[in-house]
């Protein structure tokens, strides 16, 4: 299995996109995520997307500054946080991504409307070396735009297989020699279900053990 080592992500924090996304007003897209905004000391300055995980918690990206109600940050330092957020009715079903399957990346745009991009999942894992988490993120080639960070990666069966982080610049970095991403139109990075499930297990253990709050954010 080939690893793409990277020292930065482009598009996750800064403005920009890596392709053309489309507005989507369908119920399935709009119901799969919600908007989150930064709180004090920079209220509403930053925006991201988030996905409901269960009745009480949702997940989004850690790199979005000052997100309120963060209950837990990834134990390895990966780009994931759990936030306190009550489910509004049903919450989505999750599963692991499958190499080669078609997906839809969903999230908000800077214009506060739902946007989507189509792509597929690739086998090559992505390592953000500057993060030092050691976690293997996943790759799809659907386009992303600022605001889609934390938004769902939807499989064709309606399950969510991960959440978007950002994109890797193939303009500045040649990855053509990596057979695991051959044919990819672009490299968009997402946190796969396996990492989210692992971190939920740790958070759940800490919640069940009042003496073990090492990883729970205060």
Annotate each PLM feature.
Residues 1-10:
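Sec-dependent signal peptide recognition
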Residues 15-16:
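C-terminal motif of bacterial Sec signal peptides marking the signal peptidase cleavage site
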Residues 19-25, 88-91, 165-218:
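C-terminal cap/linker of serine protease catalytic domains
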Residues 20-24, 29-74:
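A conserved glycine-rich beta-strand in the N-terminal activation segment of trypsin-fold
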Residues 36, 50, 56, 60, ...:
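Terminal peptide-recognition signature
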Residues 45-47, 62, 68-71, 110-118, ...:
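Active-site loop architecture of trypsin-fold serine endopeptidases
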Residues 56-115, 209-213:
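Conserved active-site neighborhood of the chymotrypsin/trypsin-like protease fold
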Residues 90-138, 143-149, 164-176:
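Flexible, gly/ser-rich surface segments that form the specificity/activation loops bordering the active-site cleft
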């Amino acid at each position: 299995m080939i690893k793409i080592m990277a020292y930065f992500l482009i598009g996750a924090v800064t403005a920009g996109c890596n392709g053309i996304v489309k507005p989507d007003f369908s119920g399935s897209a709009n119901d799969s995520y919600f908007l989150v905004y930064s709180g004090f000391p920079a209220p509403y300055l930053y925006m991201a997307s988030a996905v409901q995980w269960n009745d009480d918690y949702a997940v989004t990206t850690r790199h979005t500054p000052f997100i309120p109600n963060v209950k837990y940050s990834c134990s390895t330092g990966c780009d994931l946080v759990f936030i306190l957020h009550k489910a509004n009715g049903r919450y989505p079903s999750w599963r692991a991504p499958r190499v080669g399957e078609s997906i839809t990346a969903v999230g908000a745009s800077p214009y506060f409307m739902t946007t989507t991009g189509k792509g597929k999942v690739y086998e090559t894992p992505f390592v953000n070396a500057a993060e030092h988490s050691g976690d293997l993120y996943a790759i799809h080639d659907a386009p992303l735009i600022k605001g889609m960070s934390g938004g769902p990666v939807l499989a064709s069966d309606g399950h969510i297989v991960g959440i978007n982080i950002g994109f890797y610049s193939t303009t500045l970095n040649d990855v053509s020699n990596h057979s695991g991403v051959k044919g990819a139109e672009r490299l968009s990075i997402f946190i796969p279900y396996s990492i989210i499930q692992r971190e939920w297990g740790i958070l759940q253990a800490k919640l069940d053990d009042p003496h073990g709050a090492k990883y729970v954010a205060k």
